[in-house]
Curated annotation (Swiss-Prot):
Highest taxon of source: Bacteria
Taxonomic placement: Bacteria, Pseudomonadati, Pseudomonadota, Gammaproteobacteria, Pseudomonadales
This protein's name: UPF0761 membrane protein PA0951
Entry membrane topology: Multi-pass membrane protein
Location in or out of the cell: Cell inner membrane
TM stretches of this protein: 36-56, 92-112, 132-152, 174-194, 207-229, 244-264
Primary localization: membrane
HAMAP family (UniProt xref): UPF0761 (MF_00672)
Sequence similarity: Belongs to the UPF0761 family.
GO cellular component, one term: plasma membrane
PANTHER family recorded: INNER MEMBRANE PROTEIN YHJD, UPF0761 MEMBRANE PROTEIN YIHY
Keyword terms, alphabetized: Cell inner membrane, Cell membrane, Membrane, Transmembrane, Transmembrane helix
Organism (species): Pseudomonas aeruginosa (strain ATCC 15692 / DSM 22644 / CIP 104116 / JCM 14847 / LMG 12228 / 1C / PRS 101 / PAO1)
Length: 411
């Protein structure tokens, strides 16, 4: 029991470190800023899509009210009134205004994808038709799915009202769980579809459940904070709704991005996190496995790498592949597999060290031992290199920068 608790604490610390390293708070701030401009366009698009289907006619306002009642703290009621007014006015725009709203909505989706790709270490975002189709699917299918879900909710409610509470056993419980179910579905779809990387559906679902529960808890606590500590009302008066709503949007994006960090790192094993090998060592180990597979006439995928003892998670694998593909070491073989397509006999380690984006590890970060035949001579060479560097550059800066030193001068 204690071991599981320690593992949980270790994993939580690891997630917190990754959350900060991936600049998630900065991304949440950028998304908050973008949301201010995109919330009205997104709602306008939602109403437009729902109005195309007669069965969903007039349901947009009901969905908007449902969202604000269940996903925004009570302090957002005033904002809801303003947004309804803005959305009503936006429906009377000319085609130029409609295009501007669509571009604004797409900009928000681009910012979300950029933040997720940063977390998943994806350096090559979607481009062209693939990106457009994804965004169009979100903007078009999202409102339709919301409309369908809300229609089911309305049907269950009306059935209970007309035929009594016994018409559908558990209807009250089901209706109470609908907001949480919508949140789980939305977050699961977000985590599985938006990153330009392979995300296991099981991990996306686990992250969706975690984020939805955390979101509900945060909504309750935020509502209590606003009601018990009305400092914003005292300072801003009638305008207090604006900073409170901004703070809630920022907190919401922080929760969403933390859930993304969780989903991304569910594939990382406890053993791999504890080893914390320098990225250069991992790169050489991966190249060694590629070479072995090439000699056998076989391609390589992440599962093969795991069987060889390199248990790196999906995001690190994608990051290494990005570098290896740019340097023309590997090529796609189809089916998610890769092959070595460069003669390693014509590529020196010195060149790799110069081209590698990750720094050479210090002596303290080098593992004492590694079950790889190439590692002992590499370790000795790195130690010799660091000894020579210390001998060459061990003098103080005052020695190097003073007049008349033996250091080289630029003329």
């Amino acid at each position: 029991m204690r071991e599981h608790f320690n593992d949980g604490v270790e994993f939580a610390r690891f997630l917190a470190h990754r959350f900060v390293t991936d600049k998630a708070p900065n991304s949440a701030a950028a998304l908050t800023y973008t949301t201010l401009f995109a919330v009205v366009p997104m709602m306008t698009v939602m109403f437009s899509m729902l109005s195309l289907i007669p069965a969903f006619h007039g349901m947009g306002e009901s969905i908007q009210t449902f969202i604000f009642r269940n996903f925004v703290p009570s302090a957002g009621e005033a904002v809801e009134t303003y947004l309804k007014s803005f959305t009503t006015q936006a429906r009377h725009l000319t085609w130029v205004g409609v295009v501007f709203l669509a571009v604004t909505a797409f900009t928000m989706l681009v910012t979300i994808e950029k933040a997720f790709n940063e977390i998943w270490r994806v350096r090559q975002p979607r481009r062209g038709v693939g990106r457009f189709l994804l965004y169009w699917a979100i903007l078009s299918l999202g409102p339709l799915l919301l409309g369908a879900g809300f229609a089911v909710t309305t049907y269950i409610t009306s059935l209970s009202l007309l035929h009594g509470p016994d018409a559908l056993p558990g209807a009250e419980t089901l209706l109470g769980l609908m907001p949480l179910a919508f949140s789980v579905a939305a977050f699961t779809l977000l985590y599985s579809a938006v990153p330009n990387a392979r995300v296991p559906v099981r991990h996306a679902l686990m992250g969706g459940v975690f984020t939805a529960v955390l979101f509900e808890a945060a909504k309750t606590l935020f509502g209590l904070y606003v009601s018990l500590f009305p400092g914003y009302q005292l300072i801003y008066g009638a305008f207090a709704t604006v900073p409170i709503f901004l703070l809630w949007i920022y907190l919401s994006w922080m929760i969403v991005l933390f859930g993304a960090v969780l989903v991304c790192n569910l594939s990382s094993s406890r053993l791999w996190r504890r080893r914390s090998l320098p990225k250069l060592i991992v790169l050489l180990g991966v190249l060694r496995v590629f070479l072995q597979r090439q000699q056998l006439g076989q391609s390589l995928r992440l599962t093969h790498l795991h069987r060889a003892g390199w248990l790196l998670p999906e995001d690190e694998w994608e990051e290494l592949l990005d570098f290896l593909e740019k340097e023309q070491f590997v090529c796609r073989a189809g089916g998610g597999e890769w092959v070595l397509c460069r003669d390693l006999g014509a590529y020196s380690l010195h060149r790799l060290l110069n081209r590698c984006p990750w720094p050479m590890p210090s002596r303290e970060r080098m593992p004492a031992s590694l079950d790889e035949a190439w590692y002992p001579p590499f370790q000795q060479a790195m130690e010799r290199l660091q000894v020579e560097q210390e001998a060459l550059f061990g003098e103080s800066l005052a020695h190097w920068l003073a007049d008349g030193t033996s250091g080289a001068k630029v003329t």
